[in-house]
């Protein structure tokens, strides 16, 4: 299969919107975020959708008049108070910062427009907004949407083999699709 035809190619995966479960909606999360004082964390294991939800919710908040500054901790420099003025700090991979740098960033965000962060474990310094979880029905739905076909019969085993990491599972399915000849 040509890479451009692979249903698991990056450009297709990047267009997937995070799917809230249990009847929740982005408006519900936005209201809860406001109720937490505009400071909260999204948690989940590797490949559970934290970064996707972080970006989706930040986009949603921007449409509601909440401008943001987005950083990937450990890669991007820490923003100054001037850069943060009136903006929500959206920090992906917050747990990549040392304790000292994290405290400094939280203090700046607290004096600016708040903070929305993605982390792997429940933080002591931010309230929990949402816990990203993965289950087979969610992943099966994503695979069906990407391929237009039923998921492979071994999907549950593959998800387990990848410890629930959907990103790693999609890389595996990309390789599997690439190995098929037309």
Summary of predicted features, one role per range:
Residues 1-36, 175-182:
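A short, basic N-terminal segment
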Residues 37-55:
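Walker A/P-loop nucleotide-binding motif
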Residues 51-66:
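P-loop NTPase Walker A phosphate-binding motif
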Residues 68-72, 89-92, 113-120:
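Short, hydrophobic beta-strand segments that form beta-sheet elements in well-ordered domains
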Residues 72-74, 79-102:
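Conserved P-loop NTPase "ATPase switch" module shared by AAA+ and STAND
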Residues 96-134:
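Sensor-1/coupling segment of RecA-like P-loop NTPase cores
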Residues 131-154:
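Conserved small helical "lid"/interfacial subdomain of P-loop NTPases
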Residues 152-182:
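Amphipathic alpha-helical "lid/sensor" segments that cap RecA-like P-loop NTPase cores
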């Amino acid at each position: 299969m040509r890479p451009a035809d692979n249903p698991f190619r990056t450009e297709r995966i990047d267009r997937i919107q995070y799917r809230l479960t249990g009847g929740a909606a982005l408006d519900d999360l936005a209201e809860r975020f406001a109720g937490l004082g505009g400071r909260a964390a999204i948690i989940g294991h590797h490949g559970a959708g934290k970064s996707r939800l972080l970006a989706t919710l930040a986009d949603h908040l921007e449409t509601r008049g909440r401008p943001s500054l987005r950083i990937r901790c450990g890669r991007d420099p820490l923003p100054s108070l001037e850069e943060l003025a009136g903006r929500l700090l959206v920090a992906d991979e917050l747990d990549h910062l040392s304790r000292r740098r994290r405290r400094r960033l939280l203090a700046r965000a607290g004096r600016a427009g708040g903070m929305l962060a993605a982390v792997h474990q429940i933080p002591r310094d931010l309230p929990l907004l949402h816990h990203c979880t993965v289950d087979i029905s969610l992943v099966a739905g994503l695979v069906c949407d990407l391929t237009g076909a039923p998921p492979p019969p071994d999907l549950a085993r593959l998800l387990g083999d990848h410890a629930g990491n959907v990103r790693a599972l999609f890389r595996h399915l990309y390789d599997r699709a690439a190995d098929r000849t037309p």
